[in-house]
UniProtKB/Swiss-Prot annotation:
This is DNA-directed RNA polymerase subunit omega. The lineage of its organism: Bacteria, Pseudomonadati, Pseudomonadota, Gammaproteobacteria, Cardiobacteriales. It comes from Dichelobacter nodosus (strain VCS1703A). One of its GO terms (molecular function) is DNA binding. The RNAP catalytic core consists of 2 alpha, 1 beta, 1 beta' and 1 omega subunit. When a sigma factor is associated with the core the holoenzyme is formed, which can initiate transcription. GO terms for biological process: DNA-templated transcription. The gene is rpoZ.
Amino acid sequence: MARVTVEDCLIHENSRFRLVLAASKRARQLTLGHQPLVAPENDKPTVLALREIEEGKVTVQGLLDGQDVSEHLARQA
């Protein structure tokens, strides 16, 4: 898969600053051992986080509100 960029994710969030904050929070979670919600494909945590946001697996608002990813998944089910 081609690398995802911040610009690719701006359809989910208008503020580049909020998007980068959310992606960095998710990347930190992945670094600490949380399971990725997309296939890793040898990507670094920051790229995985952006891919998860771009694919709608996690939301910027949810990450910034401090919601655990498992809470987000439970509400989607």
